[in-house]
């Protein structure tokens, strides 16, 4: 019989509470050891290593050196392989995602006159090249393609390339190609796993190297990003899926259970908790889960049961709404859904969550696919300092300053005084009489 993990927070000591905060993702130490040789092989062997690892690790026997990059014909064929209603859904989602990220995009530059004649501001320019990682291990993810591609295109990154694992026949998921083209990305490589991160970092005969890589992935991908952080910007920490459903007494526990399964079904390495101070809601959720499982595919049932019956998922019963809020902030979840008739009353208490979805009509599903905000989010408590993937992740920010001749003397005098105090003679000379002599010429 299935035994869902049920924890009463008041009954746990400090160690027990700390254990609830741990994610289910595997210890990376084992992967760090195994990934090292893969990265070195790609660096030294290039395309040959990509094909070899594609065949060995992704079982893509049909992969060839000539076929590492998706062709125009493959893009065109993809539209014939995906049902029209799915293509329409992808178009709809991309429209919302683009609108959101266009609103998010900053002006190219702003300047403010801080003192008469002294101006300073910020200037934003796109990163020269980025790699977008789209996983495939437990399913097809055109949604990840949309969420990574659209902000990069809105940011006007000149060189954008998608990396995604090939199927056994050496082909790429058709819906991923449809999403890529509709989003505005034309370069897709049939490379996944640690070897994709290495190819993006070092480049090969076929792959053009990038300055940054973004997108969620397996522990192999996470380990590779960590090892290559000095070569390529690894972006925000995006590992296995995680969520908290925060429910109060104003909703039915069956609804909370329905939404609890959204992230739990991603895979056995996901983390998913229902947090509530209402015992009735908790008991209703427990009672509803078997019925919800009966409406899922066997594989997704297995995944979600592994999560909810393991150490990284289940139900947490707290003593009060305030205690629930504190638990959420300690956990710093990737996804937070607030199930309440008055969700905004809870929102003010939440400080550490990458995504906050409010009310019974805003399930994680809608946000994952088509609401508009980005669904590539920091995991493993990354929400304590990181936010969702955004246009800003694809932009460089440079500060800009301009001082006019009338404003110069006042600023120079202050700067000279501070430079002399800190012992920097050249700093002081650059704003002293020596400069004045040159400026008078």
UniProtKB/Swiss-Prot annotation:
Keyword line: Metal-binding, Oxidoreductase, Zinc
GO term, biological process aspect, one: L-histidine biosynthetic process
Cofactor binding note of this UniProt entry? Binds 1 zinc ion per subunit.
PROSITE patterns from the xrefs? HISOL_DEHYDROGENASE (PS00611)
What Pfam families does the entry give? Histidinol_dh (PF00815)
Summarize where Zn(2+) binds, as residue positions: 266, 427
Q: Where is the active site?
A: 334 (proton acceptor), 335 (proton acceptor)
Q: Which InterPro entries match?
A: Ald_DH/histidinol_DH, Histidinol_DH_CS, Histidinol_DH_monofunct, Hstdl_DH
Q: Which GO terms describe its cellular component?
A: cytosol
Needed cofactors: Zn(2+)
Task: Kindly report, in one word, the top-level EC class recorded for this enzyme.
Answer: oxidoreductase
> Which EC number applies?
1.1.-.-
MF annotations from Gene Ontology: histidinol dehydrogenase activity; metal ion binding; NAD binding
Q: Which family does it belong to?
A: Belongs to the histidinol dehydrogenase family.
Query: What NCBIfam families does the annotation carry?
Result: hisD (TIGR00069)
Full protein name:
Histidinol dehydrogenase homolog
């Amino acid at each position: 019989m299935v035994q869902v993990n049920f924890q009463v927070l008041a009954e746990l000591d400090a160690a027990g509470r700390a254990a609830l905060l741990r994610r289910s993702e595997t210890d990376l130490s084992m992967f760090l050891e195994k990934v090292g040789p893969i990265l070195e092989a790609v660096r030294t062997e290039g395309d040959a290593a990509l094909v070899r690892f594609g065949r060995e690790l992704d079982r893509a026997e049909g992969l060839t050196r000539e076929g590492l990059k998706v062709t125009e014909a493959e893009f065109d064929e993809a539209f014939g392989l995906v049902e029209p209603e799915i293509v329409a859904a992808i178009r709809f989602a991309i429209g919302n995602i683009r609108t959101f990220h266009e609103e998010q995009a900053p002006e190219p530059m702003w300047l403010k006159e801080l003192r008469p004649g002294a101006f300073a501001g910020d200037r934003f320019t796109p990163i020269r090249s980025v790699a977008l990682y789209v996983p495939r291990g437990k399913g097809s993810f055109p949604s990840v393609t949309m969420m990574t591609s659209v902000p990069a295109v809105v940011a006007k990154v000149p060189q954008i390339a998608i990396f995604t694992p090939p199927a056994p026949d050496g082909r790429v998921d058709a819906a991923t190609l449809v999403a890529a083209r509709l989003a505005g990305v034309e370069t897709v490589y049939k490379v996944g796993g640690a070897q994709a991160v290495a190819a993006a970092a070092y480049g090969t005969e076929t792959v053009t190297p990038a300055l940054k890589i973004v997108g969620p992935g397996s522990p192999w991908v996470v380990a590779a990003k960590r090892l290559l952080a000095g070569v390529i910007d690894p972006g925000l920490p995006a590992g296995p899926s995680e969520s908290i459903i925060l429910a109060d007494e104003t909703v039915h526990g069956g609804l909370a259970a329905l939404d609890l399964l959204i992230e739990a079904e991603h895979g056995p390495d996901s983390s998913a908790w229902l947090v509530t101070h209402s015992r009735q809601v908790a008991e209703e959720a427990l009672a509803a889960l078997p019925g919800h499982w009966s409406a899922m595919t066997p594989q997704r049932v297995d995944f979600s049961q592994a999560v909810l019956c393991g150490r990284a998922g289940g139900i947490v019963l707290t003593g009060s709404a305030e205690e629930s809020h504190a638990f959420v902030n300690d956990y710093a979840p990737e996804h937070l859904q607030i199930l309440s008739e008055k969700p905004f009353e809870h929102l003010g208490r939440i400080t550490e969550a990458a995504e906050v979805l409010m009310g019974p009509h805003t399930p994680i599903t809608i946000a994952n696919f088509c609401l508009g905000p980005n669904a590539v989010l920091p995991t493993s408590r990354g929400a304590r300092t990181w936010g969702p993937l955004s246009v800003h992740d694809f932009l460089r920010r440079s500060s800009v300053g301009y001082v006019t001749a009338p404003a110069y003397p006042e600023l120079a005098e202050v700067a000279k005084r501070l430079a002399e105090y800190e012992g920097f003679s050249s700093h002081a000379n650059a704003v002293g009489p020596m400069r004045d002599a040159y400026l008078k010429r």
